[in-house]
Design a protein with these regions (language model features):
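Compositionally biased terminal segments of proteins
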Residues: 1-140
Length: 140
């Protein structure tokens, strides 16, 4: 994605007042940028529940896990977040008014497929709804 396309997407996301729509757009953009660098991300946690309930449950952040065992080098994360004007350290940032957390490798033995959802800035992968709900119960 070109710097111009990223800047345009960022401007659109920042001007989006609906928090669910903003989170979906930002998730798509982040997923696309990491995919360009070879890292497949999956939306997990409260943000997965938020997307499934169409905002009926609001988590306040976007949680990602990676699908591969290969760790994402910190420099790659920093470069991508810097392109988005994000602020933060290690694996947690404030980007376009939303907190984004990179939690590590996706740990699941589920055979259920992830749900794919198209956004204006890329396709996001979301853990199955059953896993999202179980996860919320376990961590509540």
């Amino acid at each position: 994605m070109t710097d111009e396309a990223i800047a345009s997407a960022k401007s659109d996301i920042e001007s989006t007042t609906d928090l669910l729509e903003r989170a979906l757009k930002l998730s798509g953009l982040i997923t696309s940028l990491f995919a360009e660098r070879g890292f497949k991300l999956v939306v997990v946690g409260g943000s997965a529940v938020e997307f499934y309930t169409e905002g009926g449950y609001m988590s306040g952040d976007i949680d990602f896990c990676r699908k591969t065992l290969n760790a994402i080098p910190p420099r790659v994360m920093q470069e991508i977040v810097a392109k988005l004007g994000g602020k933060g350290v290690a694996r947690s940032w404030l980007v376009c008014g939303l907190y984004v957390d990179m939690l590590g490798v996706l740990e699941t033995e589920s055979t259920k497929p992830n749900r794919e959802l198209e956004t204006p800035y890329g396709t996001i992968s979301i853990i199955p709804p059953e896993l999202a709900l179980v996860e919320r119960v376990l961590f509540a």
